[in-house]
């Protein structure tokens, strides 16, 4: 990955108006991608976006670049990231492109590619696109230029796909659900999916205006959802992020239910139904309570590096079907190819209905350990804090004290000069003190 100039672990992302998220760069990216993808045969590309105002500008730039390379673009309009992956597969398109910065504020945006089978583009294709970016743009002959069209029934197709992942013999009749769409790409999808399955739906975060995506709503800020669930005396709340690939839930008492708990519920239900193949994949940040709860059920558990890309890689390596991050990325490979907030939420609802249990009760088999995270800023030129002997000594001392009833994790942020210090254990006061003790050692470097 180190030789990449533009592609990160999750496509290309940045502040709108600053390189690389500028109209001229994105036009050239469209052209370069078009040149590479045209070698593979199909000349159709699916393009979706979330609700950011900059999406209009960037999809026009992509369209021009692709057309110059001789590829035609089919636009979905605002559409969740997993929906674009699904539509890319069903239309047999050469690739899908999503214009989104997921859970980031509106002033950021990004470009992410899906391959013909709805998974991330292979590394060699990304590298070939980067190589084309170094060349001058050339236009194909006029008769060969690409066209643009709109997929008018994209939302309806995806709504039916989501409903198809919910067991036919079950219904959501009698359930009152608050759904928070983060003023993002699921605003016209998620409420309809839930209503058509029989739920009484109260929708919030469903009034996008181009600049309010993820603003005090959605999976990264569930306070509005918690308040509304309690006010409406709802059975539960579902929060999606701006592009619909994350889900966080709220039980009828207003308690947050994160990605670890959601995976626990889905894995346990899969085991009960005899449908669980292998184990479950979490990340280095997954709560120790998840690991212990799965162990009690006899379900194998493996940790991947933080990032849904790495969860997917670990699933493929082990041949397992279910993985998640505590942030709410839940990957269910027996249902779809990528993290899908709506689909994951539906599997939890199915477990509630089938077992006649509340979300609160479904979570009760898993005891969450207190997990304290402290971010410490460091100066890039002052040496690597993770290699510092004093930091190592304090960390080893804390680990020895915790034994097998806790964990310590130190890692660098992928985007900022931060060291993330995470300490987990049974006693919140103790782990808080330990986390700050290690953080102080990092600061002293």
Curated annotation (Swiss-Prot):
Post-translational modification: Activated by phosphorylation.
Co-factor binding details: Binds 1 Mg(2+) ion per subunit.
UniProt-listed Enzyme Commission number(s): 5.4.2.10
Assigned GO CC terms: cytosol
Record's keyword terms, sorted: Isomerase, Magnesium, Metal-binding, Phosphoprotein
Any Gene Ontology biological process: UDP-N-acetylglucosamine biosynthetic process
Active site: 102 (phosphoserine intermediate)
Catalytic activities: alpha-D-glucosamine 1-phosphate = D-glucosamine 6-phosphate
Cofactor: Mg(2+)
Source superkingdom: Bacteria
Residues modified as Phosphoserine: 102
Keyword Metal-binding assigned: yes
Gene Ontology molecular function terms on file: magnesium ion binding; phosphoglucosamine mutase activity; phosphomannomutase activity
S-S pairs: none
Binding site for Mg(2+): 102, 241, 243, 245
UniProt keyword Cell membrane, yes or no: no
Recorded family membership: Belongs to the phosphohexose mutase family.
Primary role: Catalyzes the conversion of glucosamine-6-phosphate to glucosamine-1-phosphate.
Protein name, as recorded: Phosphoglucosamine mutase
Gene that specifies this protein: glmM
